[in-house]
Design a protein with these regions (language model features):
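Hydrophobic, aromatic-enriched alpha-helical segments typical of multi-pass transmembrane helices
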Residues: 2-238
């Protein structure tokens, strides 16, 4: 006789499936958008590249790839918001000592979107074909890089709050309606959150790829568990 693993949540399990779909959609659309925007024209320069390299990169980007990539990234951010809202509800446990952590999860995830919606990551590229002054191009590119780095702070807070909420929730009495998240998901989130804060202090450094890739793999794992969860019952599967 075996039992089915469930997610620790005060919301009905079936309500987490849209959040799981949103997590997958956000990951696919954001990565596809970034790849489309950065893969055309001259190679994407480093954070500390000279102005001439940045100017050539912006001037050689394909306008269609830029438009489609920007569309995918915008809708990917919307899907991310749906995932964040679902996750904040999923880690909330009424009566837990750290019940407020779900609010930090929601606010931190929303702050990451707010930073990206400033448009700094795309505004300079839209004018690249019109010819940019090298200094203006460098300023726009640097603004994009700093915007990305500031997003790491919000994602770091998101990871720390989510990991803490998962681990704190496991210490509360369980029930058939609120089965537990696995502890390793909580520790994974804590490690990624701390990693984001470390690489922000080390900016500019390509070490940011490590927590960033681990973070999005974590998002896919959590999203998959949301999709697989079933409404908890007292019965067991034989």
């Amino acid at each position: 006789m075996s039992t089915t693993d469930h997610i620790d949540t005060s919301a009905p399990a079936r309500d987490l499936r849209p959040a799981g779909i949103a997590g997958w959609a956000a990951t696919v659309m954001l990565f596809t958008g970034v790849i489309l925007i950065s893969s055309t024209g001259a190679p994407e320069p480093n954070f500390d590249a000279p102005a001439a390299d940045i100017e050539r990169y912006l001037e050689t980007q394909d306008p269609w790839a830029l438009a489609v990539g920007g569309f995918l990234m915008a809708f990917g951010l919307v899907a991310w918001l749906w995932f964040v809202c679902g996750l904040a509800a999923a880690v909330r446990r009424p009566g837990a000592r750290a019940e407020w952590l779900s609010t930090v999860v929601l606010v931190s995830g929303t702050a990451a979107v707010a930073v990206m919606l400033t448009g700094a990551t795309q505004a300079s590229a839209y004018r690249g074909g019109d010819g940019l002054d090298p200094q203006v191009a460098q300023f726009a590119f640097d603004l994009t890089s700093v915007t990305l780095a500031n997003m790491w702070v919000a994602l770091g807070s998101f990871g720390l709050a989510t990991g803490w909420a998962i681990l704190a929730g496991r210490g509360e009495p369980g029930s058939p309606g609120r089965p537990a998240w696995p502890a390793w998901l909580g520790w994974w989130a804590l490690a990624v959150g701390a990693g984001y804060l470390v690489v922000r202090m080390a900016f500019p450094s390509y070490l940011w790829y490590i927590p960033h890739l681990l973070f999005w793999v974590w998002v896919l794992v959590v999203s998959t568990r949301m999709l697989r969860v079933r409404a908890a019952t007292d019965s067991t599967a034989v």
